[in-house]
Regions:
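Acidic-basic catalytic patches of nuclease active cores, encompassing PD-(D/E)XK
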Residues: 1-40
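Protein kinase-like catalytic core scaffold
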Residues: 47, 63-65, 116-119, 131
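Short, low-complexity, polybasic intrinsically disordered segments
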Residues: 122-137
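Short acidic/glycine-enriched loop/turn segments that link adjacent beta-strands
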Residues: 44-48, 127
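Catalytic cores of nucleic-acid endonucleases
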Residues: 2, 6, 71-126
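Conserved catalytic cores of phosphodiester-cleaving nucleases, focusing on short active-site segments
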Residues: 30, 49-80, 92
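A short beta-turn/loop motif at secondary-structure boundaries
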Residues: 41-45, 110-112
């Protein structure tokens, strides 16, 4: 279990590397907006959470945010958001609630006790464009 930002396996497929790059772009953008990135690629059981972060607000008070990052280079097969279906959402929620119930990140790092929400952020490359869906599910 690893939640450290730079600790990704070396044997990644090209698609996985593109996903990693998209997650890095999103993490950078959120950090520039004042968010704290607590962990990337967090494994809880068999499921993975792309980003675990804190949105400091305003307008809302600080929240723990589980971010699902999606990369899509074309809309020919629909919107990237549409790939986060019921099953994927259930897996993300289950993993997040297990982590929250444990009160810590899987690597033992602290997890702030804040209200939680689930966001989807879509990255469209060349040049990078972002669509941020807050409280998406």
């Amino acid at each position: 279990m690893d939640g450290h930002p730079g600790a990704l396996p070396r044997n990644r497929t090209p698609a996985q590397r593109l996903g990693d790059d998209a997650e890095a772009l999103v993490a950078k953008r959120l950090t520039e907006q004042g968010w704290s990135i607590l962990a990337r690629n967090v494994h809880v059981g068999r499921h993975e959470l792309d980003l675990v972060a804190v949105d400091p607000g305003p307008p809302a008070p600080p929240q723990l945010v589980i971010v699902e990052v999606r990369l899509r280079s074309t809309r020919a097969f629909g919107l990237a958001e549409e790939t986060v279906d019921f099953r994927k959402r259930r897996h993300i929620r289950d993993a997040a609630w297990r982590m929250i119930a444990a009160g810590a990140l899987p690597d033992g790092g602290p997890l702030p006790q804040l209200p939680a929400r689930f966001d989807i952020i879509v990255v469209e490359p060349d040049p990078p464009r972002f669509r941020h869906h807050r409280a998406a599910f």
